[in-house]
């Protein structure tokens, strides 16, 4: 998607499909006002800055591709790189970036690569959602050094409406003990 496309989305809004986690995928219109408010929350909750480098591997018609980090980063003037997801390439390229959003299936695919064993995700912000994020995924990414935010509801509500940030194994265990 060219930058002109982002400007049109910011000015006019856009419609995207929900992931279908709560039933059939729904086409939901995102008004310019909703996008602006959602971008502000995404910027704040994920600590996006003008110096952020976003690696987008979700499709642009998916909230994870457009709303999680890409549109907020565009608003800031941050660097954005968009490409089709390939788990081997993601492992090879992620350390060039500060932020990436994965859906759980992508996270699982990344974890199955040979490069995962030696991957260091220190100082990388991973947002993951669109479907249930299993504890073992959160734990695996945090053990690699990532700050990991699990989120849901970004199409219907906002990009970071329901989220929890994990930056240590202790925090994972503390949170799990409260809900289990």
Which residues does each predicted region cover?
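Conserved pre-ATP/AMP-binding loop-to-beta segment of ANL
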Residues: 2-17, 47-53
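Short Gly/Pro-enriched turn/cap motifs at secondary-structure boundaries
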Residues: 174-180
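AMP-binding/adenylate-forming
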Residues: 26-45, 49, 53-112, 125, ...
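Conserved adenylation A10 loop of the ANL superfamily
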Residues: 12-28
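Conserved G/P- and acidic residue-centered "switch" motifs that form tight phosphate/ATP-binding loops
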Residues: 21, 77, 153
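Gly/Ser/Thr-rich phosphate-binding loop
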Residues: 99-102, 111-173
């Amino acid at each position: 998607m060219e930058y002109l496309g982002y400007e049109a989305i910011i000015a006019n809004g856009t419609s995207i499909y929900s992931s279908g986690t709560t039933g059939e995928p729904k086409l939901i219109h995102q008004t310019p006002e909703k996008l602006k408010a959602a971008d502000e929350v995404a910027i704040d909750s994920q600590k996006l800055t003008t110096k952020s480098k976003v690696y987008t591997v979700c499709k642009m018609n998916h909230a994870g591709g457009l709303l999680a980090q890409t549109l907020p980063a565009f608003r800031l003037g941050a660097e954005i790189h968009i490409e089709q997801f390939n788990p081997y390439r993601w492992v090879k390229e992620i350390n060039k970036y500060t932020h990436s959003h994965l859906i759980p299936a992508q996270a699982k695919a990344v974890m199955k690569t040979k490069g995962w064993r030696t991957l260091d995700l220190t100082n990388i912000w991973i947002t993951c959602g669109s479907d249930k994020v299993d504890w073992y995924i959160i734990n695996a990414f945090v053990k690699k050094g990532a700050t990991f935010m699990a989120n849901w509801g970004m199409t219907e509500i906002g990009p970071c409406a329901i989220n929890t940030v994990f930056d240590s194994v202790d925090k994972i265990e503390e949170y799990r003990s409260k809900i289990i």
